[in-house]
């Protein structure tokens, strides 16, 4: 992913699932497969808050779900992880856009993740 802040706009009246597709890319000369792990990482948000003078909070884990591992096989240079948000519960519980999901991407021992592309912060904004 890009190291930045992503906004997922969601129309609660749409009846559709609230899903963010996080695209992961494999680069370099690595023909072997690699498994990367997605980890909720509050330290990513801590840095972002300090750098931007904000007080965003980590979204409680009951409001989202994702597969923590993504496998990029040897010939596959890109895959996506589906981050699913429970928009109905978020609305019912008053979880607003001050709550975000900070994620880090970590590689297994077969590779490494470029520091400038190893994290993302996702905010869900209800329309």
Predicted regions and their residues:
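Short, hydrophobic beta-strand segments
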Residues: 68-77, 81-92
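Acidic/polar, low-complexity intrinsically disordered N-terminal segments immediately downstream
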Residues: 1-61, 65, 78, 90-102, ...
